[in-house]
Amino acid sequence: MFDFLIKYPISIFEIKEFLAAALNCPFDKILVVSSEENADPEIAAEEWDKLCCLCIGTEVEGDVAWLLNLYRIEATDDEIEKRIIAVSQTKQIACYVPNDNWNGYLLTGSSPTPIQVYEDEEVAGENKYIFTSAI
């Protein structure tokens, strides 16, 4: 599983386009469902094996519009991270991508180079993400 956040609201279709580009995966082999729909996604059992990505999206608050949980990807977390950053920068879709710094994320797609930011847990809450540029 790989999680990342999208800063501004975009549609499920746009999320699917973003993931197809980032994961080098056919558009029709990606299933994006909202967390509310996740209980019973409409897909035949034999189609599950053909998916190259299952994405569960949760609409959240604060500095972020979407929390995306990615499953069924045949790549390492490092590879996925690099691909998401590259497509975010190219398409200028602002994302928060977790990195190894304590509680740190890279804000990508909003400036020429990624910016190190940190989640402010004192202000954030369940399904609410707030970021700061300093610890």
Describe the role of every protein-language-model region.
Residues 18-20, 29, 33, 44, ...:
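General "foldedness" signal
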Residues 22-73:
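N-terminal low-complexity, intrinsically disordered segments
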Residues 51, 57-135:
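Charged interaction segments
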Residues 1-28:
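Short, extreme N-terminal segment that most often corresponds to the first beta-strand
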